[in-house]
């Protein structure tokens, strides 16, 4: 579906991404985790063609992404960046209609199919009845769902989300994560997201990619990646790891001075 092949990228002397190799399969939910400045958002922006690597290639559905027309990329891949303008003088429906941009005719008007897709995006994100509300009048969670609805209106197979739960309270975080789960399970969307909440990443993802200083350090299912060595190596903390009903989760204990190593076994504590 989307592959990052031997990519090199540097935006300053202090940060370099070297020989990055990632392959995302169709239908996967993949979360990028790691400390601040590790390259998570940079990797996502490279995949979205918002940044251009100096070496290597990024392939979307068999085609080099930098040889494709922008409109063709936008028909296959949508990205919601971390920050958006919440003060736009737009209604929810007007915002969502922007998602139809890559599909519009040269006249720029919405046809019947466009209107049906906008209505579908409103329905999927539980925003029916909000279409004529101004963005400024919405709660944080409602606004985030409106922006996600705009990306859904592109009708792509791949959705990139950069910290979609940042600045939201726990209820609205769970609303967004449950929406991500539904988009994957009901509509088969491939979803790649940057998350700071590692427990949420483990709960809602098929795979975790762990970055540090521009390098991919761990790549695997949550049960394998969430181990004591990873937390020591990547975050410099000691943790307790528990096995939930489906996925593992952790609680932090203290800052660690140990270096960490590879996760060679499942260091999981049973729930009492």
UniProtKB/Swiss-Prot annotation:
GO cellular component annotations of the record: plasma membrane
Family annotation (Pfam families): ABC_tran (PF00005)
Membrane topology field: Peripheral membrane protein
Catalytic activity entry: a Fe(III)-siderophore(out) + ATP + H2O = a Fe(III)-siderophore(in) + ADP + phosphate + H(+)
Signal peptide span: none
EC number: 7.2.2.-
GO biological process: iron ion transport
CDD domains, per database record: ABC_Iron-Siderophores_B12_Hemin
MF-aspect GO terms: ATP binding; ATP hydrolysis activity
Location(s), subcellular: Cell membrane
Knockout-associated phenotype: A mutant lacking fatE, fpuC and fpuD ATPases is deficient in petrobactin import in iron-depleted conditions.
Enzyme class: translocase
Keywords for the protein's UniProt record, in alphabetical order: ATP-binding, Cell membrane, Ion transport, Iron, Iron transport, Membrane, Nucleotide-binding, Translocase, Transport
Translocase found in the keyword field: yes
Subunit structure: The complex is composed of two ATP-binding proteins (FpuC), two transmembrane proteins (FpuB) and a solute-binding protein (FpuA).
Similarity annotation: Belongs to the ABC transporter superfamily.
Protein name (Swiss-Prot/TrEMBL): Petrobactin import ATP-binding protein FpuC
Gene this protein is translated from: fpuC
């Amino acid at each position: 579906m989307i592959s990052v092949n031997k990519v090199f990228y540097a935006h300053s002397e202090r940060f370099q991404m070297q020989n990055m190799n990632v392959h995302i399969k169709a239908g996967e939910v993949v979360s990028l985790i790691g400390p601040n400045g590790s390259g998570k958002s940079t990797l996502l922006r490279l995949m979205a063609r918002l940044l251009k690597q100096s070496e290597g290639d990024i392939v979307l559905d068999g085609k080099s992404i930098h040889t494709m027309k922008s409109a063709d990329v936008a028909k296959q891949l949508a990205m919601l960046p971390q920050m958006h303008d919440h003060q736009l003088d737009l209604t929810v429906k007007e915002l969502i209609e922007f998602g139809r941009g890559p599909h519009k005719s040269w006249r720029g008007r919405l046809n019947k199919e466009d209107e049906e897709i906008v209505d579908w995006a409103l329905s999927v994100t539980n925003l029916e009845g909000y279409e004529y509300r101004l963005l400024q009048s919405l709660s944080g969670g409602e606004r985030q769902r409106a922006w996600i609805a705009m990306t859904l209106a592109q009708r792509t197979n791949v959705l990139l989300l950069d910290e979609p739960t940042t600045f939201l309270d726990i209820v609205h975080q769970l609303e967004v994560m449950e929406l991500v789960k539904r988009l994957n399970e009901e509509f088969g969307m491939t979803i790649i997201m940057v998350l700071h909440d590692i427990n949420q990443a483990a709960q809602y993802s098929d795979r975790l990619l762990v970055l540090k200083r521009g390098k991919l350090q761990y790549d695997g299912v949550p049960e394998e990646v969430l181990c004591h060595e990873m937390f020591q190596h990547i975050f410099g903390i000691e943790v307790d790891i528990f096995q939930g009903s489906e996925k593992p989760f952790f609680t932090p204990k203290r800052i660690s001075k140990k270096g960490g190593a590879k996760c060679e076994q499942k260091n999981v504590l049973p729930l009492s």
